[in-house]
């Protein structure tokens, strides 16, 4: 049986914890769980900074045990579909956020100079180019770049193997 588990609860921060394997070994992991934001930030930390911090943790490292889990998706309560009012105080337009942060992350890891693993990338609209629906709407045709982000992760994995000995 292969696998690992991570003990974490929803947080509005980037934090370090441990990733535990099925045979008892543990490795450090940095988690970007900045998901409930307003106007692009929470408690002074922007979503862009959270993505960058998580990627920087594994960037160019020689330590194969360094992992990150980058939760690229989020909900921006200032950009809610329902008349600008946040649903239950937490839910905003996730197609709006996917449009911004999927594209940003894809561009960052797909750049020629990027070397390193991207860790675990969690996203809304994986492999989808456009949203089909979102909260408060029956139809949304916003470009969400889920296809570009999946492609960037796959390309980076291939690029890393080819370029690590340059």
Task: Write out the residue ranges for each language-model feature.
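Catalytic cores of phosphodiester-bond hydrolases, prominently lipid phosphodiesterases
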Residues: 1-166
